[in-house]
Design a protein with these regions (language model features):
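N-terminal charged segments
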Residues: 1-81, 165
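Acyl-donor-binding surface of acyltransferase catalytic domains
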Residues: 69-143, 233, 238-239, 257-263
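A conserved beta-turn-beta hairpin within the catalytic core of GNAT-like acetyltransferases
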Residues: 46-61, 190-198, 207, 255
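Short amphipathic alpha-helix that is part of the acyltransferase structural core
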Residues: 1-21, 118-164
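Conserved acetyl-CoA-binding loop-helix of GNAT-fold acetyltransferases
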Residues: 70-80, 202, 208-225, 248
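A conserved beta-strand-loop-helix scaffold within acyl/acetyltransferase catalytic domains
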Residues: 157-205
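Active-site rim helix/loop that mediates acceptor-substrate recognition in acyltransferases
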Residues: 16-30, 101-103, 153-177
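Conserved beta-hairpin
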Residues: 31-38, 102-113, 170-184
Length: 264
């Protein structure tokens, strides 16, 4: 059964805050608002990460609908937060919450434009149905040091950096090996009763061998052992193989995050 979208969105925002606190780069500014004119928005600011793509730009506002205390005048206050740090592009990640049409209207009124190049679905898996996937690759849980040593083999440095930098209690790292060669990476984060599947990447030369489906299966198994009652993962519609792998493993779409972009 798919959980309530608004409740899940609020929990995912807490999870994001916690993950960020464990892998925070030195340039990242984090601000959690509680009530007031910015509701319960969570804001991250990083002048060094102003890429044109929402997934790699760390200048973000995480917002769940029209939160209590917010109004149209909240949006200029958001903009000022970024301008003060000399950030010229940021994204609002709008997840389900109260009065969504009102929230959309506030953002559009102040010049934010919805990014429709792709969608950002959040998928979840409930229940305890086992999932197995056979591959000729070897899947192993590994240390952070082994992840760091393997990162150069994967060709998708940003994703492997994300996996490597999140560490400590609650994080589990996995590699797929072809003999002694690491060819794919993935991580699991356990937060409250959520098992969050994150930071997956496969070397270009070893795609279509089932590495990620096998890594999904291994993380489902580990999350069950940790007592998680729900598994969650996030992807992009344009990464069709990622979305398809999650659906095959029993994940269902819970909601889509709407991405709004602001440029100075």
């Amino acid at each position: 059964m798919i959980p309530d979208a608004i409740g899940l969105a609020q929990r995912m925002r807490r999870l994001t805050q916690w993950v960020d606190s464990r892998r925070q780069p030195p340039t990242l500014i984090r601000r959690q608002f509680r009530g007031g004119s910015l509701g319960n928005c969570y804001v991250t600011i990083d002048p060094d990460r102003q890429t044109p793509f929402a997934w790699s730009n760390l200048n973000r506002v995480y917002m769940c609908g029209a939160e209590a205390g917010m109004s149209s005048s909240s949006v200029p206050r958001m903009i000022d937060l970024f301008l003060t740090e000399r950030v010229n592009r940021f994204f609002v990640w709008l997840s389900p919450g109260p009065d969504m049409d009102t929230a959309r209207g506030w953002l559009e009124q102040h010049g934010l434009v919805r990014n429709r190049r792709t969608g950002y679905p959040t998928l979840c898996r409930t229940g305890h149905a086992p999932y197995r996937f056979e591959t000729d690759l070897e899947i192993r849980e590994v240390s952070e040091a082994e992840i760091a040593a393997a990162s150069g083999h994967l060709g998708e440095r940003q994703w492997s950096d994300d996996a490597c930098s999140a560490c400590g209690d609650g994080f589990f790292h996995y590699l797929a090996f072809d003999g002694d060669e690491p060819v794919a990476i993935a991580a699991l984060c356990v937060f409250e009763d959520i098992g969050y599947l994150m930071a997956a990447a496969t070397a270009e030369s070893h795609r279509k061998r089932g590495a990620q489906q096998a890594l999904i299966a291994k993380r489902i198994e580990r999350a069950e052992q940790a007592g998680c009652s729900i598994l969650v993962s996030e992807t992009l519609y344009m990464i069709e193989h990622s979305y398809r792998n999650l659906r095959r493993a029993g994940f269902e779409e819970a909601y889509e995050k709407e991405i709004y972009e602001w440029n100075a």
